[in-house]
Amino acid sequence: HDAFKVNAKQIFDSYYNKGLFDKKVTETIFKPLLEAKNLNLNITLKEFYEFSNIDLHIFTFELNNFQTIEMSHTTHPELQLLQVLTMSSSLPGIFVPIIIDNCCYIDGGVLCNYPLNQCLRDHTNKNEILGIKSSYNKETDKFANVEVTSESSLLEYIICLSINSMNYIRDTIKMETIENTVKCYVLENPLTLGSIKESIQNQELRRQLIQMGEDDALEFLATIVKL
């Protein structure tokens, strides 16, 4: 909740900063998790791998060259973990993009929201992979578009353009499938400005979302038991 406070200055500055929230949001969210393991906020991908022995791959989208960038301890060892996490989640209009060496990094979901194909490239045994996938429509298993109305703000218009473009691009990419997939369904698109505001301000809604995720996981586990 403390990470997403919005004031008038932020709204005015977002015109030049290209977003409402900067990397401080990521630091606020992950600080207690890292400190619980006695890890520094400035920990690099290489250092995090040495600590965890987890081959973590994070995907971001570089806007100027219009390409997906895969980041790990082998490709970008000296980049800070929190910086890379910020790059991968910078939804246009909401989060300030990370700009390094004339490259503009935004949410990796533009072309790679669910990097299953990349995972199978490195690990071909589908039985060893567990996917966790979100979807807004249980019947079509697709993401819902966001609508612009006469009451929509400029920020909501930008978010709508971003999300709907991402949805269209994702639908054109051929995706592999695996049996071991936890499908998490939500009632509405959680990336609209209204949904983000409500989830930040409404503690009960956050509990409901967590419970929905738990229910989806239990439903998946029940199918495993039957097998």
Outline where the language-model segments fall:
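Patatin-like phospholipase
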Residues: H1-L227
